[in-house]
Regions:
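Glycine-rich phosphate/pyrophosphate-binding beta-alpha loops
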Residues: 261-269, 339-352
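A long amphipathic alpha-helix within ATP-dependent nucleotide-binding catalytic cores
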Residues: 208-240, 244-326, 360-373, 379-381
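Redox-cofactor binding/interface segments in oxidoreductases and associated redox assembly factors
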Residues: 19, 89-90, 167, 226
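A short beta-strand motif that forms the metal-chelation/ATP-contact edge
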Residues: 325-327, 332-342
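Short acidic-glycine loop/turn motifs at beta-strand connectors
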Residues: 73, 182-187, 247-251, 328-330
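Nucleotide-activated donor-dependent transferases that construct or modify glycoconjugates
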Residues: 13-27
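Active-site nucleotide/adenylate-binding loops and adjacent lid/helix of ATP-dependent enzymes
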Residues: 109, 113, 119-226
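Conserved N-proximal alpha/beta basic substrate-recognition cap immediately N-terminal to
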Residues: 31-38, 45-146, 150-154
């Protein structure tokens, strides 16, 4: 039985915040339960009633959604029917192209519905983000050479000219589906992770066999070819730096924290979901780069703080960004990616808890700011699904 949102309880909150997400498997189809529970409790402190809803469970005529609210009393997620929320926090992750296609139209419709304010509009894909960042002359020198994979011969061309490359899906996350391909004395070597985030490694004597294998591996999904950067320690462990940029209680961007993510031994990626771990950025860089670490850290911060301004200028309103930055073996800094729906696991693993606490609290503080002022954020420009 689905309960309706209790009117008397709802009136104790000044506003409602709906966390929009794609349903997970299980009896209670709420993903990111731990994170969403924290948001609910913080929302209660701030006078916000928080619930989770799904874009495929919307009653447009009655302006209602079916979703779940966390009950601190019972410690459970309770299924209810809610009025349309005042603000929407988008945490939808699409498992594949079919899921994206299924949710695209209802989300577009919700974006254009009067009385609903999206805290931010999700970025489309890695190629789209790369193109927007390339338009900024200050960021352009820090972006690795990148192009869309149109045909398998593109890979052969890159290998002929550069000897190695990095192949990554346009819509992927968690380091899934990535490959490093390189020329080796007796053919070609391939290292990476499958779409299920399992390690993969192989060798091919001929270009044709390697390309046939890559064709099956990519399986028709959109991919990017990128210059391979040697972002690893002296012992060969891959690492990068996650900078979390968020809007705060005043509607301004701030750098919430920096965390180094080091991949599992032998991994081509630094992602934690592939068995890596997180460390504090300053001491980690100090061990690797000595006296140069201070300058590298300042470059990382400068890049991270520039990215939100550029993306909002070309894309539209954003609420937070995970900016991934690499440092190669000679200390050069590279802007790798920007993600509008960042995770927080790297900061939760650090010894200091301030960044981890702020990472969770800031979206709610910004939501309260938006609801209290209804101004102070740029109007939506070209953001689209």
């Amino acid at each position: 039985m689905v309960k309706s949102m209790n009117t008397r309880k709802a009136q104790t909150a000044l506003h409602t915040l709906g966390i929009m997400t794609c349903p997970a498997a299980g009896e209670v189809p709420v993903p990111e339960k731990f994170y969403f529970r924290k948001l609910t409790l913080i929302g209660k402190e701030l006078g916000l009633a928080v619930f989770v809803f799904f874009p495929n469970r919307i009653d447009w005529q009655r302006r209602r959604v079916v979703g779940y609210a966390y009950s601190a009393e019972s410690g459970r997620w309770e299924k209810r029917v809610f009025p349309f929320p005042d603000v929407v926090y988008d945490r939808c992750f699409y498992s594949n192209r079919n899921a994206y296609a299924a949710y695209r139209e209802p989300i577009r419709r919700l974006m254009s519905t009067s009385g609903i304010h999206f805290l931010g509009y999700g970025l489309k894909g890695k190629w789209n983000v790369h193109q927007m960042l390339m338009r900024d002359e200050r960021l352009r020198p820090f972006l690795p050479e990148t192009e869309q994979l149109q045909e398998m011969n593109d890979i052969a061309r890159w290998l002929d000219g550069k000897g190695e490359l990095f192949l990554k899906p346009q819509g992927g996350s968690h380091g899934k589906g990535v490959l490093r391909i390189q020329k080796i004395p007796d053919g070609f070597g391939v290292t990476g992770r499958t779409a299920r985030n399992e390690p993969v490694r192989g060798g091919f004597r001929s270009s044709s066999r390697m390309l046939d294998w890559v064709r099956q591996f990519t399986n028709g999904r959109p991919y990017l070819i990128q210059r391979y950067l040697h972002l690893n320690t002296a012992s060969g462990d891959a690492f990068d730096i996650r900078a979390l940029m968020q809007k705060n209680s005043k509607g301004l961007w701030e750098l919430t924290g920096l965390a180094v993510r080091q991949g599992a031994p032998g991994s081509v990626t630094s992602n934690l979901h592939g068995g890596g771990h997180a460390e504090e950025a300053k001491p980690y860089l100090g061990r690797l780069y000595g006296d140069a670490a201070g300058g590298i850290l300042e470059s990382v911060k400068t890049l991270a703080q520039r990215v939100p301004e550029v993306l909002e200028q070309h894309h539209g309103r954003l609420v937070e960004l995970g900016v991934d930055i690499g440092v190669d073996t000679d200390g050069s800094v590279w802007l790798l990616e920007a993600n509008s729906k960042p995770g927080r696991s790297a900061f939760a693993a650090l010894p200091g808890k301030q960044a981890s606490l702020s990472a969770v609290r800031n979206p709610m503080l910004y939501a309260k700011y938006v609801l209290d002022t209804r101004k102070g954020v740029p109007a939506r420009q070209s953001a689209s699904l």
